[in-house]
């Protein structure tokens, strides 16, 4: 029977075990926004808070990509650190920020897929949540 040869795992929705729910917006300090609220902040400079659940350094472009709260392909907020910005870091963001709750300050823009994100150019734009 064809059913016995089917792999039903292919039909399941893929989730990443690192994914988390966004922080409760009502519990954040004034002026801080969670990853779900980021979409309403497009075009504004603000501070977004979330957990780095996926992180990748691209050797080809020398860029770093961080997803907060939800991993690719279901990401709801991304942080991009391009080659020129990465030079301003004293650490490897994809290593040292992975699994941590962080704040990211900058202008929220949409990527080509409509996902909000911030391009970071300086280390000071990212802080560990506990440091705030």
Named regions from a protein language model:
Residues 3-132:
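OB-fold single-stranded nucleic acid-binding module
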């Amino acid at each position: 029977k064809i059913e016995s040869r089917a792999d039903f795992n292919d039909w399941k929705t893929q989730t990443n075990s690192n994914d988390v729910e966004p922080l409760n917006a009502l519990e954040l300090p004034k002026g801080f926004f969670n990853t779900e609220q980021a979409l309403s902040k497009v075009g504004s400079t603000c501070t977004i808070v979330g957990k780095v659940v996926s992180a990748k350094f691209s050797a080809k472009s020398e860029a770093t990509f961080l997803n907060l709260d939800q991993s690719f392909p279901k990401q709801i907020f991304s942080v991009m650190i391009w080659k020129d910005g990465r030079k301003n870091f004293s650490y490897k963001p994809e290593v040292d920020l992975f699994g941590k709750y962080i704040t990211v300050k900058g202008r929220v823009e949409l990527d080509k897929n409509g996902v909000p994100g911030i391009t970071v150019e300086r280390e000071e734009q990212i802080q560990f949540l506990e440091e705030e």
